[in-house]
Amino acid sequence: MICPPGENKSMAERKQGGQGNGVGSSVVTEVKPKTQKPSLYRVLILNDDYTPMEFVVYVLERFFNKSREDATRIMLHVHQNGVGVCGVYTYEVAETKVAQVIDSARRHQHPLQCTMEKD
């Protein structure tokens, strides 16, 4: 089979209905690796009897970008229920936020506890 310029044999064979000896008629499909979304983790603040409520609101605004209203709502939930969710993040981000909260609490001499758990 003579191929027109710019076409290879398999292109010419396909134009003729794929009639050929089978050489050069394989189909290449691109295989994309399946990626999974990363696991998410809830960052939790735990209630205690010593950390001022205003400091908890500050932490929620500063490290979790909460509005004053949302921070106050979460702080009251923590106060009434003993624990509250600050946000849901990938592992590394959650780990960093927990460390930031604990570090800030220690610098301000508050016993505030923060932890994370798989969502």
From Swiss-Prot:
Residues 1-29 are annotated as: Disordered. Disulfide bonds: none annotated. Gene3D superfamilies: 3.30.1390.10. Signal peptide: none annotated. It comes from the Bacteria. GO terms for biological process: protein catabolic process; proteolysis. InterPro entries: ClpS, ClpS_core, Ribosomal_bL12_C/ClpS-like. NCBIfam families: PRK00033.1-2 (NF000669), PRK00033.1-5 (NF000672). Involved in the modulation of the specificity of the ClpAP-mediated ATP-dependent protein degradation. Belongs to the ClpS family. Binds to the N-terminal domain of the chaperone ClpA. This is ATP-dependent Clp protease adapter protein ClpS. It comes from Caulobacter vibrioides (strain ATCC 19089 / CIP 103742 / CB 15).
